[in-house]
Amino acid sequence: MGSIDEVKKESAGETLGRLLKGEIKDEELKKLIKFQFEKRLQWGYKSSHQEQLSFNLDFIKSLKKMEMSGEIETMNKETYELPSEFLEAVFGKTVKQSMCYFKHESATIDEAEEAAHELYCERAQIKDGQTVLDIGCGQGGLVLYIARKYKKCHVTGLTNSKAQVNYLLKQAEKLGLTNVDAILADVTQYESDKTYDRLLMIEAIEHMKNLQLFMKKLSTWMTEESLLFVDHVCHKTFAHFFEAVDEDDWYSGFIFPPGCATILAANSLLYFQDDVSVVDHWVVNGMHMARSVDIWRKALDKNMEAAKEILLPGLGGSHEAVNGVVTHIRTFCMGGYEQFSMNDGDEWMVAQLLFKKK
């Protein structure tokens, strides 16, 4: 009997209430989360190829009628402004908050972070002496990796988080890197006449909606010789917004505020080639993401008391608020494991595409 049949009927509010009170043990939480993703699969898979294609094309067409981005400011405040000391306690040495790449079973999180950065550089065809723009650069791990490995490159990170800009510039100074810049801006509002040899976007395009407008904007920062490398989480067959699939879906809205995240299909970006054209296309098995989030959760659990102490001052000394943040992050990690390990990593995964300017 599958988990859909095993989960007792309960309203979304009741489930969230129990979760935030600490009344749901991990084993039950795993079942509750898996139940939501099984419902998503039932929602997304259609009975015939024709119906599936029509469903997918309707989604693509709907994106082209939307604003360029989702609720970026909401996402920024709720997810990306955590203290750097907290992030360092949970993530690996480069504080990478996206998929890490495990070359072998015994790989550590630090090795997997570096392997992911290496993979990006290989597939984006990074070469020494290039100008590189990392859009949605996070804490700047990839920016710093490129700046250290390719010393003649000039690498710029763009983020709408002041905390991330400060962290990146501080790390660059510590490492004595003079080939690093950071831009504080919302990419959808940022205007520049500057062009770059390579544009990178790692797990950030998920916060965009109208990809036709967005890819057009990115193309203005490219020359005829430039390449754009995009890495995004995806489902292998269908796209969906990370929003409630029905009224009993407590999970989706808890993890991401409504309107903040779009999960594309593995081939969705192929429908947005008005201003760029695809050069290459890969997928990475979801187990790499599943292992990443599982290691993050274990690190949080191991450093729980210290992590809570770090969070406390920024949350007005409220232990309830601290518990809320920690519960959110643990649930995100547990959910990510269930999502990306489904069907041995062959349902939700990571797509990578390389584009040139048209």
Swiss-Prot record:
Compartments it resides in: Cytoplasm
GO cellular component term of the entry, any: cytoplasm
Assigned keywords, A-Z: Cytoplasm, Methyltransferase, S-adenosyl-L-methionine, Transferase
Active site: residue positions: 333
Keyword set includes Lyase: no
Main location (coarse class): cytoplasm
Listed EC numbers: 2.1.1.-
UniProt catalytic activity: (S)-stylopine + S-adenosyl-L-methionine = (S)-cis-N-methylstylopine + S-adenosyl-L-homocysteine; (S)-tetrahydropalmatine + S-adenosyl-L-methionine = (S)-cis-N-methyltetrahydropalmatine + S-adenosyl-L-homocysteine
Family the entry assigns: Belongs to the CFA/CMAS family.
PANTHER family referenced in this protein's UniProt entry, alphabetically: PTHR43832, S-ADENOSYL-L-METHIONINE-DEPENDENT METHYLTRANSFERASES SUPERFAMILY PROTEIN (PTHR43832:SF1)
Subunit and interaction comment: Homodimer.
Annotated function: N-methyltransferase with a strict substrate specificity for (R,S)-tetrahydropalmatine or (R,S)-stylopine.
Protein name, UniProt field: (S)-tetrahydroprotoberberine N-methyltransferase 1
Native organism: Papaver bracteatum
Taxonomic lineage: Eukaryota, Viridiplantae, Streptophyta, Embryophyta, Tracheophyta
